[in-house]
Amino acid sequence: MKLHEYQAKGVFADAGIPVPESTLASTVDEAVEAADDIGYPVAIKAQVQVGGRGKAGGIKLVENADEAREAADEILGMDLKGLHVDRVLVEAAVDFTDELYVGVTMDRAAGKPVAMVSTRGGVNIEEVAEEDPDAIVREHIDPAFGMHPFQARKAAFEAGVDRAVANDVASILTQLYELWADKDATEIEVNPLMVTDDDEVIAADAVMNIDEDALFRHPDLEEMEEEAAGDELEAKANEYGFDYVRLSGNTGIIGNGAGLVMTTLDLVDHYGGEPANFLDIGGGAKAERVANALDMVFSDDNVDSVVFNIFGGITRGDEVAKGINEALEQFDEIPKPVVVRLAGTNAEEGMEILNTDLVTVEKTLEDAVQRAVKYAEEEQ
């Protein structure tokens, strides 16, 4: 579960990590009132879970009430990389002299958590990692002992953080690790961590991803789950109990089993397509569950075709076929082309059940993916 910026900053503030004064607003009038209360200049920031909000027009710095009204009116209601903006965070602007990056995640290759520090904050850290990996200092942590203060200071100094703020940066890094461990986070980061001219450090942005399987241990975070859903589709996925990730392409993908879905994503990319989503219907899926999956994918306006990749083990091919037929028979006209590949338990029965007036059936995964990619290209 990925928290919104305002939610993550609330968690940070409760842990004692400095964050700018801010107020959440859902109307233009609320945004202007919040800006007046905080005092100008303020930043008005779209609360949607996408990167590059600033470049896409989702973050604006304003100097007065008129500018605040104009910015809030422009941002509220906009579609930002496919997500509808219905809330903004009105936040005190930070006058900074430097931008840093700090974060904690799991290094699966090392089998340990890793804390990271860089003086290249305020930019896409993935690009920094690719172009100049030495610009990010990594410090592995033994989870049995936690992060020692000396490790955090070592990472800050090795990264080249100014001595005047190195101890404060190290303290925040230690707090981030403690949050990462205590809240069962999978990733936590601040980018940028701003340094002011009077040597204060402030978390100007916040990213926090929580292991959904551990939410039962955190009632405070569980309460945030509905609001944390990035859009209506993700909220619907939670309701249906699907593992779903929205992507930026136009070929919808439905499968049973994470590995099978990932393989399908890779093949869509291999054959020149762009995946629109990751959707795993799980094992033993009945007709209703399959119909719900199709309803979800069709609800994404970016989808131009859909490919089903089902391998029957617990999930029976005939049940899947019934679900596909039931879902498609609800439409007077099929919204988008659907390609189906069935294999395994009762696959032959399933292919006989499928209404070929509604779907295209392919025997191999490669053929199914190529057909779906072709359909998506033709729909554009």
Curated annotation (Swiss-Prot):
One Pfam family, short name: ATP-grasp_2
Function: Succinyl-CoA synthetase functions in the citric acid cycle (TCA), coupling the hydrolysis of succinyl-CoA to the synthesis of either ATP or GTP and thus represents the only step of substrate-level phosphorylation in the TCA. The beta subunit provides nucleotide specificity of the enzyme and binds the substrate succinate, while the binding sites for coenzyme A and phosphate are found in the alpha subunit.
GO biological process: succinyl-CoA metabolic process; tricarboxylic acid cycle
Domain ATP-grasp: 9-236
EC numbers for this chain: 6.2.1.5
Cofactor remark: Binds 1 Mg(2+) ion per subunit.
Reaction catalyzed: succinate + ATP + CoA = succinyl-CoA + ADP + phosphate; GTP + succinate + CoA = succinyl-CoA + GDP + phosphate
Pathway: Carbohydrate metabolism; tricarboxylic acid cycle; succinate from succinyl-CoA (ligase route): step 1/1
Source domain of life: Archaea
Gene (UniProt): sucC
GO MF terms, alphabetically ordered: ATP binding; magnesium ion binding; succinate-CoA ligase (ADP-forming) activity; succinate-CoA ligase (GDP-forming) activity
Name listed for the protein in its UniProt record: Succinate--CoA ligase [ADP-forming] subunit beta
